[in-house]
Amino acid sequence: MQGQAEQKAEPAARTPAADELVSYDPSTGKELWSAKLGDAPKEVAAARTAWPEWAAHSNAYRIEALRRFANVVRKEEAGFAELIARETGKPLWEAKTEVASVVNKVDISIEAYAERTPQRRMEAALGNKVAVRHKPHGVLAVLGPYNFPAHLPNGHIVPALIAGNAVVFKPSEKTPATGEFLVQCYHEAGIPEGVVRLLVGGPDQGRSLASQSGIDGLLFTGSARAGMALHKQFAETPQKILALELGGNNPLVIWHAKDLDSAATIAVQSAYLSAGQRCTAARRLIVPEDDHEPLITAIRKLLDRMVVGQPFDDPQPFMGPLIDAAAADHVQEQWLNLMMKGGKPICRLERPDGQKPFLTPGLIDVTDVRDRPDEEIFGPVLQLIRVKDFDAAIAEANNTRFGLAASLIGGSPEMYDKFWANVRAGVINWNKPTNGAPSNAPFGGVGLSGNHRPSAFYAADYCAYPVTSSEADRARASIGEGLRDPNMQED
């Protein structure tokens, strides 16, 4: 399948037209893709027209269509992974895992729909029969992120389609080519073009889509700031569903781990996979004051060996560039801010080529920094915090407005029980990284990390609404109290 994305020779220097969106390869700076900006009212109208017929089909019909979609993605796996690698800069090996996740999401969503939104019939009081079934909302808008431009929006779109909704999907303006390719896969599988619409554009088109009266809800993955803006906007439309999957300032507590090499490996995986551009990436490493130096030495040795490079290099790098120069600039500014506040670099964050968004992994001790910013540093930066005891470690883990992921490495079962009971997060792990959440479980956070609409296995919950019905074969009714006897005469 051939989309509009091509390898183009020209650099990113040309100025796009006012009505055009251009995507660039972050590892080279060259133009990758371009298209005209879309029209949100037009796309919503098309989805509204197509929705009733799609909703009228049986679940089995829609499930079969999604299974065909999975087969299309399998067939296009190599080209899809290459496109993701080019547009995001992530290594090809990682792009391949994303394509595999797109495929796996179908069977997981089918299972989730059956488990979370089944038809149920029950007996109520006095022999009454009760049925619980679910209906689709209608037309759902999906706003996708750039870090997993296929997997994360697909995690909204597939369960929405199974439930009988139509979708208008606006990919991130930084990864539109991947979004277009994903939509083409739905269409090639025989899902009507009106049922899955692609809206090309940037923030203006996203705001326009969110404001359309013709949508029945919006499913968003992105920053807390954008999520809060959507939350305020949708406060005036409580009849519309809003699911927010936001970021995190995630703690990784390593407490007297017996296997230092494994603990260091988990720390590196948690903090630096995808160049730190994961909402579940570890941002804060919390360790005991009296027993941390051997661990830090082990982490430094891994960081010294870490390869940062182009997505198609052979051998493959551990991580590629950030999504663009602006993102790299922002992470560098956040790093410098920590240093200005008294942070002590252990492994310095560096930018080998100032014109490109490649960053080396940074590790900085911020124990003595006052007023540490409670923000998501969306890049390869890990902040070390030394504490006196395990209670202080838990308090530090909770020292954030976010609440997405947290992990404890080491400790005892009793300590993990205490950690689990007292840490406020939607994902809490033991001896596992903060990232890599399983798709057959709910995924979401509390605080500024979401609005209590977890995705993954629980996405079925926000893609359909329950309808309770009391039912009988024929009407039988009587009024037992409060009526005069018809045979009695009034005085």
How would you label these PLM feature ranges?
Residues 25-34, 215, 351, 358-491:
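Conserved C-terminal structural/oligomerization subdomain of aldehyde/semialdehyde dehydrogenase
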Residues 51, 55, 70-77, 81, ...:
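Structural signal for hydrophobic packing residues in well-ordered secondary-structure cores
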Residues 29, 62, 84, 106, ...:
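Residue-level signal for inorganic ion chemistry
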Residues 217, 225-368, 430, 478-479, ...:
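ALDH superfamily catalytic-core signature
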Residues 118-262, 316, 387:
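Rossmann-like NAD(P) dinucleotide-binding subdomain of oxidoreductase/dehydrogenase enzymes
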Residues 31-35, 49-56, 142, 252-255, ...:
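Short, well-ordered beta-strand elements within core beta-sheets of diverse protein domains
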Residues 166-168, 345, 427:
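A short hydrophobic/small-residue beta-strand
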Residues 1-129:
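N-terminal Rossmann-like NAD(P)+-binding subdomain of aldehyde/semialdehyde dehydrogenases
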